[in-house]
């Protein structure tokens, strides 16, 4: 069943909605429902920012959440886009399948696609990138209320020694898995199943998976 209505006027635009008009010519060689099945690969456009860009996705989500310009760390995010994401060809291609995904989860997925992380810095919504960090200061005894304590966790059999990254291939649009292994341990005993959103390239999925595997071995 369907409900129909006659519109008194024809709209010329639909704000915040992308529309498409198709003219399809069918014949008796098509199945009954084939003329109604249309696949579309759409490119996400951002106002004032490059399409598919990680920074553009950041700003789009933050603005949609109600963040003002003075609450966003534009300098840091733009620097990451200019120095890392754009030169390395890193983009974010993902759409939410339901309304149950929180804004924080989406921001974290955007950052993961750029080998980074979302954070709040000095009250601003910002992003960081994993890697070697410059020291930012020293801790002196005058600033401590008790003795400085450090902790170290050694490798154990409970740690992952392999990572399988599942992503959606941009050519087949099917889920595929890349295996991330160390050359000295091609048959790991404990493998992590990691789902990567927003990445459609197998090389990028492999690099992100290997970074994750390196953290399990060397980041203590």
Report residues per predicted region.
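Surface-exposed interaction regions enriched in Ser/Thr/Asp/Glu
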Residues: 1-67
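C-terminal extracytoplasmic interaction modules
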Residues: 47-220
């Amino acid at each position: 069943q369907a409900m129909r209505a006659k519109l008194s006027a024809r709209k010329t635009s639909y704000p915040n909605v992308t529309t498409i008009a198709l003219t399809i010519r069918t014949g008796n060689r098509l199945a009954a429902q084939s003329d109604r099945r249309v696949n579309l690969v759409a490119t996400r456009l951002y106002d004032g920012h490059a399409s598919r860009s990680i920074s553009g996705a950041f700003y789009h989500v933050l603005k949609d959440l109600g963040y003002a310009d003075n609450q966003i760390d534009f300098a840091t995010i733009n620097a990451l886009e200019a120095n890392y994401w754009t030169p390395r060809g890193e983009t974010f291609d993902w759409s939410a399948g339901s309304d149950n995904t929180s804004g924080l989860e989406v921001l974290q997925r955007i950052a993961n696609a750029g080998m980074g992380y979302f954070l709040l810095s000095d009250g601003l919504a910002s992003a960081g990138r994993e890697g070697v960090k410059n020291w930012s200061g020293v801790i002196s005894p005058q600033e401590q209320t008790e003795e400085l304590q450090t902790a170290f966790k050694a490798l154990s059999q409970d740690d992952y020694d392999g990572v399988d990254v599942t992503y959606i291939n941009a050519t087949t649009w099917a889920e595929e898995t890349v295996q991330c292994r160390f050359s000295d341990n091609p048959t790991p005993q404990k493998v992590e199943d990691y789902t990567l959103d927003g990445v459609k390239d197998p090389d990028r999925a492999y690099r992100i998976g290997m970074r994750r595997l390196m953290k399990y071995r060397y980041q203590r």
